[in-house]
């Protein structure tokens, strides 16, 4: 289908729902610019929104409702027609979407790795005993506690600029962030070291952008189809299956990372206790041609982790999280 045919079928307007942080708006603008290139006659607008996840900054996500806090308001805008599509960092999207919504396009992935950011130290290995390291995720916290038990790991909330400001004012000796966000905002110079995926497998979907729509909007799905990257989509389908099968959420240090090598998809899954004392890892690979293949690969990795006792870790962490919420 040529661009003239696509443009002729495009709507007069499209509205993108997005969080209002600088990174989220960059992502929405990235999608807007791609849509404008595809459909020059279409007026593409951005509806900026503040989500509960952006408002609650004094507690970790695992204690206040998880990743859904970042998407609920955007889904409401899709449901009531204020927006036609919503753009997300895929790692922030819950593994199971509410009925009536779907991730219809997954864009080509940025760097999925975690980044070490510090003003005074070149790497995690250079940090002295007792140095304070900030992170927003239990997955990264578990990695730090397992590999660097001499460090003091503390929660770090807020958008990307807020986190960097907290580092710059001396609250932390170093912080761990997703490399993709820093690169997208032109802040790659802040990265002192990129952490190898063997040491710190990323969260499912990290580095990828997902576009969500209401499932009845088949017209929007068709317009978004040219933005979809099939290889990235198959990789993140496998990753998200690992997390979904194990009940993964913000309460569980769970990583899932897939990479293409010589035509096959290699998938690694990892589940840890929050103190890093127990770390379970599983790896599988296969020829993945369809979504069903990707889901099967994800299930194979989750089955292997279950055989190692992953559900014992997951259930204990979920029970502890629920008990903590009850005490709040």
From Swiss-Prot:
InterPro entries: HemC (IPR000860), Porphobilin_deaminase_cofac_BS (IPR022419), Porphobilin_deaminase_N (IPR022417), Porphobilinogen_deaminase_C (IPR022418), Porphobilinogen_deaminase_C_sf (IPR036803). It catalyses: 4 porphobilinogen + H2O = hydroxymethylbilane + 4 NH4(+). Its EC number is 2.5.1.61. Coiled coil: none annotated. Binds 1 dipyrromethane group covalently. The modification S-(dipyrrolylmethanemethyl)cysteine is found at residue 250. Its cofactor is dipyrromethane. GO terms for cellular component: cytoplasm. Pathway: Porphyrin-containing compound metabolism; protoporphyrin-IX biosynthesis; coproporphyrinogen-III from 5-aminolevulinate: step 2/4. GO terms for biological process: protoporphyrinogen IX biosynthetic process. One of its GO terms (molecular function) is hydroxymethylbilane synthase activity. It comes from the Bacteria. Keywords: Porphyrin biosynthesis, Transferase. Gene3D superfamilies: Periplasmic binding protein-like II, Porphobilinogen deaminase, C-terminal domain. CDD domains: PBP2_EcHMBS_like. Belongs to the HMBS family. Monomer. Tetrapolymerization of the monopyrrole PBG into the hydroxymethylbilane pre-uroporphyrinogen in several discrete steps. The porphobilinogen subunits are added to the dipyrromethane group. This is Porphobilinogen deaminase. It comes from Burkholderia ambifaria (strain ATCC BAA-244 / DSM 16087 / CCUG 44356 / LMG 19182 / AMMD) (Burkholderia cepacia (strain AMMD)).
């Amino acid at each position: 289908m040529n661009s003239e045919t696509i443009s002729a079928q495009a709507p007069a307007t499209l509205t993108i729902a997005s969080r209002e942080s600088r990174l989220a708006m960059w992502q929405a603008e990235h999608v807007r610019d791609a849509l404008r290139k595809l459909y020059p006659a279409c007026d593409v607008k951005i509806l900026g929104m503040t989500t509960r996840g952006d408002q609650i900054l004094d507690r970790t996500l695992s204690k206040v409702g998880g990743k859904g806090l970042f998407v609920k308001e955007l889904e409401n805008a899709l449901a009531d027609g204020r927006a036609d599509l919503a753009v997300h960092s895929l790692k922030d999207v819950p593994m199971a979407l509410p009925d009536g919504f779907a991730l219809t396009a997954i864009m080509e992935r940025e760097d999925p790795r975690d980044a070490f950011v510090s003003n005074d130290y070149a790497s995690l290995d250079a940090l002295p005993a007792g140095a304070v390291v900030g992170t927003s995720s239990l997955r990264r916290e578990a990695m730090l506690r397992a590999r660097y038990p001499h460090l003091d790991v503390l929660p770090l909330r807020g958008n990307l600029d807020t986190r960097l400001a907290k580092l710059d004012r001396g609250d932390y000796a170093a912080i761990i962030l997703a490399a993709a966000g820093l690169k997208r905002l032109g802040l790659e110079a802040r990265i002192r070291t990129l952490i190898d995926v063997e040491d710190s497998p990323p969260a499912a979907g990290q580095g990828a952008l997902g576009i969500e729509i209401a499932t009845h909007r088949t017209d929007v799905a068709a317009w978004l189809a040219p933005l979809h990257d099939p290889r990235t989509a198959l990789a993140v389908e496998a990753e998200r299956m690992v997390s979904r099968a194990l009940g993964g959420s913000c309460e569980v240090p769970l990583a899932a990372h897939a990479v293409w090598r010589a035509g096959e998809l290699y998938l690694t899954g990892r589940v840890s206790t929050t103190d890093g004392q127990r770390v379970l890892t599983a790896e599988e690979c296969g020829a993945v041609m369809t979504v069903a293949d990707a889901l099967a690969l994800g299930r194979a990795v989750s089955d292997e982790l279950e055989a190692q006792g992953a559900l014992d870790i997951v259930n204990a962490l979920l029970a502890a999280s629920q008990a903590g919420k009850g005490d709040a």
